[in-house]
Amino acid sequence: MKPDLPPRIAVLLVNLGTPDEPTAPAVRRYLKQFLSDPRVIEIPKFLWAIILNLFVLPSRPKRVAEAYASIWDGDSPMRNILNAQVEMLDKRLADRAAPFRVSVHAAMSYGNPGLPDVMDQLRSEGVDHFVMLPVFPQYSATSTGAVYDAITKWSLKQRNLPNITIVKDYFAHPLYIKALADSIRRFQAVHGKPEKLMFSFHGIPQPYADKGDPYPKRCKCTAAQVAHELGLKPDEWIISFQSRFGKQEWIKPYTDVVLKEWGSSGVRSVQILSPAFSADCLETLEELAIENRETFLHAGGQEYHYIPALNADEAHIDLLEAMSAPLVKGWAGTLDGWA
């Protein structure tokens, strides 16, 4: 009788998503899926459907597609970087996990490769253990919460459920804090130290925070720990929030407003990073690196630099490995060959 193969384990790195190409039709498809999620837009469904289909989707895709085209490099930067992260982590876990079959895969909450489709494919290939690692360092119902929703909806359709473990977030993980601090040190070794260091996180509407979303507190904790690691004084750094959408109040202070105030009040040099993003994308490469640079310089600032996300840096893969390997090992047991 042929012996059973060891269980196959899949680690999924899950990011938010990106259009398939930098064109208005592709962006429209992506935005419709993204902005139709009630986790993202908490407005009565009927009312929001009218706003989305009559006002947002007819006008916004063309403008957003042009922004994507300015940063496109054969594919979306987010997808390119996520694929690189997957390849690096896959090699590390495969080297450690023999004789167990472990593989790492990319998935997206919106767009391709969609999380349910990836799970369907892996399940058909014999995967019976999933480690879900949403690469959102700070939990929010609008990001990680949507991953939980997608997994739940997928699970409702399954007769024979696999084992699933989800990493909620890692906003204060020591390796994450150190990786951020070291990336800032390396950048400043080349570009010098600025008058102000800005930690700009993607914002969420203020009512979401009022209802209990822990995201703002997690962002503040991350920024404070990195600032402490760097030995910064309170007046040398600030936390802010970017990427507002719509007319309602979002969590403050707003990144662009602070930059205008700094530029007009005599602050000459600024460096900015966004710890909320595990991979550079439209919000960092276009909004932070280009738009907000123009905002600061136009207001009177003289020097502005964007510090890249952790992307596929070795220290970032160290972090991803540190979070996923113990979960894989827990299922793989302690057989010889696991390091």
Curated annotation (Swiss-Prot):
Identify the residues that bind Fe cation.
H202, E283
| Entry keyword annotation includes Cell inner membrane | no
**Which keywords appear in this protein's UniProt record, sorted alphabetically?**
Cytoplasm, Heme biosynthesis, Iron, Lyase, Metal-binding, Porphyrin biosynthesis
One Pfam family, short name: Ferrochelatase
Top-level class of the enzyme under EC nomenclature:
lyase
Checking InterPro entries in the record gives: Ferrochelatase, Ferrochelatase_AS, Ferrochelatase_C, Ferrochelatase_N
The reaction(s) catalysed by this protein are:
heme b + 2 H(+) = protoporphyrin IX + Fe(2+)
Q: In which pathway does it act?
A: Porphyrin-containing compound metabolism; protoheme biosynthesis; protoheme from protoporphyrin-IX: step 1/1
Output one GO BP term.
heme biosynthetic process
Described by its record, this protein's role is as follows: Catalyzes the ferrous insertion into protoporphyrin IX.
Family the UniProt entry places it in: Belongs to the ferrochelatase family.
Q: What is this protein called?
A: Ferrochelatase
